[in-house]
């Protein structure tokens, strides 16, 4: 794989993580219902954890002499995470985040493999940590939905 394709893959990962952060924040801000407090706190925990990683990831991209995608148009174009314009019921919000988190865990696994192939061990460690974080988010969301 050439360096340009590698950077494009990392930018897609970054954009997808940012879109997931935004969706979790949206759900945190707008959740309603009898289980409001439980979902409100869960979504807050998720978006706070992901927000910290977005900043670190942007710095990792800059270390690769690449720019972090920063406009909403570019983020939306690159992301595998679909935005949510509606306000679903709390369980539907959690289910949507669960699917997205599972997809991100797999995307981060693939990113890890690419970083290892490129000999970028620092970034591969970060990507492995992100995969683990999304597995944990998925576990918490899945357990909440039972």
What are these regions (language model features)?
Residues 9, 55, 59, 76-128:
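Acidic/histidine-rich alpha-helical segments that form the ligand environment
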């Amino acid at each position: 794989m050439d360096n340009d394709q590698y950077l494009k893959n990392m930018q897609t990962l970054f954009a997808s993580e940012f879109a997931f952060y935004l969706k979790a924040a949206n759900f945190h801000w707008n959740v309603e219902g009898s289980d409001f407090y439980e979902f409100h706190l869960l979504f807050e925990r998720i978006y706070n954890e992901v927000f910290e990683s977005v900043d670190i990831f942007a710095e990792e991209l800059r270390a690769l002499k690449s720019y972090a995608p920063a406009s909403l148009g570019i983020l939306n174009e690159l992301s595998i995470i679909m935005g949510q314009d509606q306000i679903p019921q709390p369980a539907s919000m959690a289910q949507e985040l669960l699917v997205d988190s599972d997809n991100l865990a797999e995307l981060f696994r693939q990113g890890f493999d690419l970083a290892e192939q490129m000999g970028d061990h620092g970034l591969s460690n970060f990507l492995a940590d992100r995969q683990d974080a999304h597995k944990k988010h998925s576990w918490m969301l899945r357990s909440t939905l039972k």
